[in-house]
Amino acid sequence: MKLTINKNSAKWMQLPRDVLVGHGVLEEVGDVCRDLKLKGNALIVTGSTTQDVAGKRVSRLLEDAGNSTETVLTCRATMEEVDKLMEKALNTEATFLLGVGSGRSIDLAKLASTRLEIPFISVPTAASHDGIASSRASVIDNGKNASIQAQAPLAVIADTEIISAAPYRFLAAGCGDIISNYTAVLDWELASRLRNEYFGEYAAALSRMAARVVIENADSIKPDHETSARLVVKALVSNGVAMSIAGSSRPASGSEHMFSHALDRIAPKAALHGEQCGVGTIMMMYLHGGNWQEIRDALKKIGAPTNAEELGIEDKYIIEALLQAHSIRPDRYTILGNGLTLSAAEKVARITKVIN
């Protein structure tokens, strides 16, 4: 049988080449760079706290391996910071970047390295969201949150000893980000049926599997447990791979993420991204007619927020975010359609007990 190839169906899938997850794997950073033939000057992007947690060790280990290093401390994930990083990388003739942190540093290194067309390595110090292995970067551009296509990390080095020592709130937020895959995939399927949008079965299956693993193990995800950190990190890496396979964030970002981004815009003090996505997933699963109680119960077992009070956000902002969510990404069709009415928003929030 002759195989016919449709060139228009070809997709570019960029995946991490090396993924190290486990106790003490940070010590392997020099070997990873040798394996990947990364030589010369390394620019380490980190924060004031994560520099002490892992950044200084990464610098020492790379210098022991024969690399020279420079370190940049970041404070905000903005396009201005990306521009500064690019300038620093050019001035120091950096041949590769490392993002060492819980999210911001990784996203900045990811985007700067993409624009400079040089590799970068992701070194997460917490497992709070799936950006640690994805080809998307979340930054503030012109005062608004933006999710920008970028390159996937060439390697991910996730030391569970470090990650399990981070505040448990970050790990619980990571679980919320993973569990949100369920409604993201349902939205994707809906867009495929109603708008004839491309739907990737394999990416969707991988995304669902990651969410299912977290829900089925919700009872065993506890603070200070490296086994919990390992499980969550692997699921977050799976999320990143699913998005790379799909060529978009569709497998892991739908109406629940739009709700979270709307909260970021309007709430005086937003919660963690994964926390907001988890609460959003409860409500969006209700709109899909699914088992929203299972989502809520899993988040409760994990210790993640399930309502506005636990998020530290007033009820009125939850309602306003529901009303605005559909407009966050007008090109992305979800269960929100053209938007909820005020009465519908209040109904879903009250029935799911997100507000009182």
From Swiss-Prot:
GO cellular component terms attached to this protein's record: cytoplasm
Pathway listed: Membrane lipid metabolism; glycerophospholipid metabolism
Pfam hit, one: Fe-ADH_2
Positions bound to substrate: D130, D177, H261
Cofactor remark from the record: Binds 1 zinc ion per subunit.
EC number: 1.1.1.261
Family annotation (Gene3D superfamilies): 3.40.50.1970, Dehydroquinate synthase-like - alpha domain
Catalyzed reactions: sn-glycerol 1-phosphate + NAD(+) = dihydroxyacetone phosphate + NADH + H(+); sn-glycerol 1-phosphate + NADP(+) = dihydroxyacetone phosphate + NADPH + H(+)
CDD domains in UniProt: Gro1PDH
Binding site for Zn(2+): D177, H257, H273
Protein name from the UniProt record: Glycerol-1-phosphate dehydrogenase [NAD(P)+]
Gene: egsA
Family affiliation: Belongs to the glycerol-1-phosphate dehydrogenase family.
Subcellular location, record wording: Cytoplasm
Organism from which the protein derives: Methanosarcina mazei (strain ATCC BAA-159 / DSM 3647 / Goe1 / Go1 / JCM 11833 / OCM 88) (Methanosarcina frisia)
A GO biological-process term: glycerophospholipid metabolic process
Cofactor dependency: Zn(2+)
Entry's Gene Ontology molecular function annotations: glycerol-1-phosphate dehydrogenase (NAD+) activity; glycerol-1-phosphate dehydrogenase (NADP+) activity; metal ion binding
Keywords from the UniProt entry: Cytoplasm, Lipid biosynthesis, Lipid metabolism, Metal-binding, NAD, NADP, Oxidoreductase, Phospholipid biosynthesis, Phospholipid metabolism, Zinc
Entry-linked InterPro entries: G1P_dehydrogenase_arc, G1PDH, Glycerol_DH
